Amino acid sequence: MTKIIVRSAALVKQGQLTLYSTSLKVSDLLIPNFYSVETLDPDDDNDKGYQRLLNRARAKRLADYIIDGQETKDAFLPTSIFMATHKNIDFNPTNNTIEINIDTIGPFSVVDGQHRVEGLKMAAEKDTRVLDFEVPVNIAINLPKIAQMCHFLIVNTT
């Protein structure tokens, strides 16, 4: 089943990099094959990723915070998730929207924000109200894997 997501977005150019700044609902992030996190396990010689291994305790702390915020209506997560694809995304400059067809684009690589994504996923599994929670997302397009790795290093060391 194809799901197409249409969201308002701002086109951002930074040198050679093209980004779309938008927001996604947690339910969008949970679409099968929507994202992948390429981790590097130092104990696995065949592992070719670049992300640190997931710290489940850190993700759970975020999940607990988001769930608590559903009751008080004050959950706040302003820090964006940085995703990337080596493909292009359709952008409509007339109405400033992007169209994401995950069957043709996906999965997005999570360059920065794997603990936020996992925490949101954990929260949604416990409280379905979280599915409608929106999070800021920056999506880089036409970005090869090696460039994604470089951006991960820049974001996490600069």
Language model regions located:
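N-terminal extension/subdomain marker
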Residues: M1-L77, T85-N92, T97-E99
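Basic- and aromatic-enriched surface patches that contact anionic nucleotides/nucleic acids
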Residues: Q51, D74-T79, M83, K87-T158
